[in-house]
Amino acid sequence: MWEIFWSDIAQDCGKGLLAGGASLAIQCVAPRLGRLLKHIRARWAGRKHGHLDTTAPVPRLKRRLAAIFATDVVGYSRLTEVDEEDTHGRLKTCWTEVIDPTIQRHRGRIVKNTGDGALVEFVSVVDAVRCAIEVQRVMAVRNTTVPQDRRIEFRVGVNLGDVIVEPNDIYGDGVNVAARLEGLAAPGGICVSADAWHCVRGKVAAQVVDLGPQRLKNLAEPAHVYAIPPAVGTT
């Protein structure tokens, strides 16, 4: 609509300029501009009195089905309180040497990195769970030479759900469930929603514990949860 309107304005203005200069050009476009102002006033009056303009197009939210992987460092505040610089350096090394390359190998996309955690999107839920398992196994091996109170351990939650897509973020219940599952996981462990697990069952090599329905924070209904216990070497 607006492209046509401004095109007409330009044409009228051009005709006026060719016919008689600037003053005639203004006379040519004045009627169209007057109608535009009248339209704007009418819409403003409707908003002012609480009336919605049902003719105005409502922008649609972009949505898609995605496998969501949420992770966080266990006891990060405690670790930084003991030695902030050492913790930051070791965590940065974990991201560079373990987590980032593992996510890339499994075709994941890091949506958000909070420093001590991340939100990652996968097209395949099988890739998401395999990535989580690999990260936890590698971290378990690295932690065998680290004192227990200084270990960097992750919790991971994986969900399959519908998400709202923004240019640099994703939102919605699918993301919220993944974050709550992460909080339910044991240090070094993984919690997976039933929707996600039904897609990966028989496709990943891992011991799985059926936790049954679990109450997740700020979610009205219990969610059926499956847990992949910590790999050997974690606490």
Question: What function would you assign to each model-found segment?
Answer:
Residues 1-38:
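Hydrophobic, helix-forming membrane-interacting segments
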Residues 15, 19, 84-85, 190:
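Alpha-helix boundary/capping and short turn/kink residues
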Residues 35-47:
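Short, Lys/Arg-enriched, Gly/Pro-containing loop segments at transmembrane-helix junctions
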Residues 44-63, 228-235:
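Intrinsically disordered or compositionally simple regulatory linkers and C-terminal tails
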Residues 51-138:
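Catalytic NTP-binding/metal-coordinating core of nucleotidyl cyclase/transferase enzymes
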Residues 100, 119-233:
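Catalytic beta-strand-to-alpha-helix segment of the class III nucleotidyl cyclase homology domain
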